[in-house]
């Protein structure tokens, strides 16, 4: 049977959900092919969304019309702001989720979205003519025609599950791997490599002894992810903290020879920042204990996920390890931990739209691009979906810059640098992180969302009004010069604030940590009518004014630099500071400007700085 649509999405994980929903929302006829409809939106690993860097991604996806934020707000079990005591740039919202509620909410959203159809089958091969996508074939002899195809297969491409010495061809425990499509992608000449990730054991909630374990609560004023969420008052459950101990470590050491990670059974590289427990014991042998979090998987507390205990050790060893841990002495394992090895395509094969350079109309998103994490997958799925629709309409692509969004950082890192290990987002990856805070996501991306038709006009008008009020009042505060007069000193004293000794402007005064929103309204009467969202932005802009201005200067400098032309016949060889790889790529592609050079995979900002300097030096000489 032959069926037609505008866009095909292959895979119903977090990337596939966002890609299919956003494309349908933008008016395309979308068909989602997934192996099991019941597993759409399944959280395969930890029962949580968000965190440091990841919370930023989730909120950016939300503002740009994505679903992850609203699904999380409707399925969370505990909400917290991580790094709450630190500056706003490095804070991150995180939620424990009810995995069943999340999956059901996501699945129903997909199944009830106009312009979006779903079928349960396995994609086996791509149909390509003249290096352009035409469609796909499936395992039940269906042919789907579409000009745009988005592959979001997660860990299913040639997936192999490892538990001790045992191996099974699975894309997830108990589910078939996608071997035909994996072979097809290799035959098409893509640079295919292997990665590894893992998951932790789960235990029955009624078999845990919680007495004596440290209880971990959610925030009293729980944060939420979606700007559309109203009247947020979730039921929150506690997590619990326990630790491994020297006995645990000895059990693991005694079984290193049976660990797939060390026996040579696993070839793929695992996530650096989420190592297995056996890897931690091996690498950090001096540590006497490692922290573990017991996280409820559902509101019923029937199962707990042991966060921090990712493992692929044999079943009998997993039993001994778990029973050596305080609170888990009599725990019943409901699901064992395992490692999974899978194919991914080097993301340097992609443009910034996530379209492959090799085949027009083919987009990749999620773990197939070498990333790890639900949030990273969702962000890529969203951007692939948006760009596939824009390409169908012959409109300009939507590419976020590194100074606009963490999504921009994520995609730029992937397509220019590639990866040899599962890529995870952190705030430290963003050089402009002071501008890319969670609290200003709406202000950063609202304009884009509205332009793309992904934000309602009334809300957008209110947002623009808020932005104007922020700018106007910051200008007024800068122009407001205060002197240490009797009246000023008296008012500061009434607010329990230290006196000023010299002239200061309003921005400098509000930069004080102690000057909260209530004091702001009290001291500057013109701030009194402003809503809390506007006041909060004014406060943050004042506090980090010097650093924010510096980052804006750096952005302007970079934008100016990228406009610099590279002289015809320019010799790249012999320039100190340029790696051999950079020289080879520059000689091969012969960019006409620094902007064109910046688009070449493997060319770093440091390379551009060096090039800029030597272009200038050679012109002057």
From Swiss-Prot:
Binding residues for NAD(+): 270-284
Asked whether the UniProt record includes Oxidoreductase among its keywords, one would answer no
Per UniProt, which keywords does this protein have?
A: Cytoplasm, FAD, Flavoprotein, NAD, tRNA processing
Cell compartments where the protein resides: Cytoplasm
A Gene Ontology biological process in which this protein takes part is:
tRNA methylation
Alphabetized InterPro entries for the sequence: FAD/NAD-bd_sf, GIDA_C_N, MnmG, MnmG-rel, MnmG-rel_CS, MnmG_C, MnmG_C_subdom, MnmG_C_subdom_sf
Q: Which GO terms describe its cellular component?
A: cytosol
| MF term (GO), any | flavin adenine dinucleotide binding
Give binding positions for FAD: 11-16
- Chief localisation class: cytoplasm
Top-rank lineage group of the source organism: Bacteria
- Cofactor entry: FAD
Describe the subunit structure.
Homodimer. Heterotetramer of two MnmE and two MnmG subunits.
| Entry's family note | Belongs to the MnmG family.
Q: What does it do?
A: NAD-binding protein involved in the addition of a carboxymethylaminomethyl (cmnm) group at the wobble position (U34) of certain tRNAs, forming tRNA-cmnm(5)s(2)U34.
| Protein name, as recorded | tRNA uridine 5-carboxymethylaminomethyl modification enzyme MnmG
Organism, scientific name: Helicobacter pylori (strain Shi470)
């Amino acid at each position: 049977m032959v069926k037609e649509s505008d866009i095909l999405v292959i895979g119903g994980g977090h990337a596939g959900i966002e890609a299919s929903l956003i494309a349908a929302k933008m008016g395309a006829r979308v068909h989602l092919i997934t192996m099991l409809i019941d597993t759409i939106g399944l959280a395969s690993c930890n029962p949580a969304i968000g965190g440091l860097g990841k919370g930023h991604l989730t909120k950016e996806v939300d503002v740009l019309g994505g679903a992850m934020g609203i699904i999380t707000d409707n399925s969370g079990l505990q909400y917290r702001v991580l790094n709450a005591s630190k500056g706003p740039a490095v804070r991150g919202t995180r939620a424990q989720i009810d995995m069943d509620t999340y999956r059901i909410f996501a699945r129903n959203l997909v199944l009830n979205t106009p312009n979006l159809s779903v079928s349960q089958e396995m994609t086996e091969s791509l149909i390509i003519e003249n290096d352009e996508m035409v469609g796909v074939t499936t395992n039940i002899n269906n042919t789907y025609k579409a000009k745009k195809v988005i592959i979001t297969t997660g860990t299913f491409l040639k997936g192999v599950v490892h538990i001790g010495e045992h191996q099974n061809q699975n894309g997830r425990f108990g589910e078939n791997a996608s071997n035909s499509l994996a072979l097809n992608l290799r035959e098409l000449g893509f640079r295919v490599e292997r990665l590894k990730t893992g998951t932790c054991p789960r235990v029955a909630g009624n078999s845990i002894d919680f007495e004596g374990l440290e209880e971990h609560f959610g925030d009293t004023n729980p944060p939420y992810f979606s700007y559309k969420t109203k009247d947020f008052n979730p039921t929150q459950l506690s997590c619990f903290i326990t630790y491994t101990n020297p006995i645990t470590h000895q059990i693991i050491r005694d079984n290193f020879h049976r660990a797939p990670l060390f026996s040579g059974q696993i070839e793929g590289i695992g996530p650096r920042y989420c190592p297995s427990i056996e890897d931690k014991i091996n690498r950090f042998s001096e540590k006497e204990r490692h922290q573990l979090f017991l996280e409820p998987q559902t509101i019923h507390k029937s199962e707990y996920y042991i966060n921090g205990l990712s493992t692929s050790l044999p079943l009998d060893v997993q039993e001994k390890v778990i029973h050596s841990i305080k609170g888990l002495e009599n725990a019943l394992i409901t699901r064992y931990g395992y490692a999974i090895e899978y194919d991914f395509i080097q993301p340097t094969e992609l443009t910034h739209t996530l379209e492959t350079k090799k085949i027009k109309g083919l987009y990749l998103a999620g773990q197939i691009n070498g990333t790890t994490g639900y949030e990273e997958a969702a962000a890529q799925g969203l951007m692939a979906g948006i760009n596939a629709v824009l390409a169908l309409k012959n409109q300009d692509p939507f590419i976020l810059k590194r100074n606009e969004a963490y999504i921009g950082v994520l995609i730029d890192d992937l397509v220019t640098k590639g990866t040899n290990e599962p890529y995870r987002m952190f705030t430290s990856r963003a050089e402009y992180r002071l501008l890319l805070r969670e609290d200003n996501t709406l202000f950063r991306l609202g304009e884009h969302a509205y332009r793309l038709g992904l934000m309602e006009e009334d809300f957008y008008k209110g947002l623009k009004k808020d932005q104007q009020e922020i700018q106007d009042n910051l200008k007024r505060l800068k122009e407001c010069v205060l002197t240490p007069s009797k009246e000023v000193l008296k008012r500061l004293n009434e607010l329990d604030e230290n006196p000023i000794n010299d002239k200061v402007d309003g921005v400098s005064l509000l930069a004080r940590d102690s000057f909260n929103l209530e004091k702001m309204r009290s001291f500057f009467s013109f701030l009194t009518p402003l809503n809390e969202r506007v006041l909060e932005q004014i406060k943050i802009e004042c506090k980090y004014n010097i650093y924010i201005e510096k980052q804006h200067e750096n952005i302007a400098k970079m934008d100016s630099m990228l406009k610099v032309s590279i002289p015809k016949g320019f010799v790249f060889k012999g320039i100190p500071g340029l790696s051999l790889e950079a020289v080879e790529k520059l000689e091969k592609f012969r960019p006409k400007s620094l902007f064109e050079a910046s688009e070449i995979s493997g060319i770093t900002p440091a390379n551009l700085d060096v090039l800029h300097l030597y272009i200038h030096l050679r012109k002057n000489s």
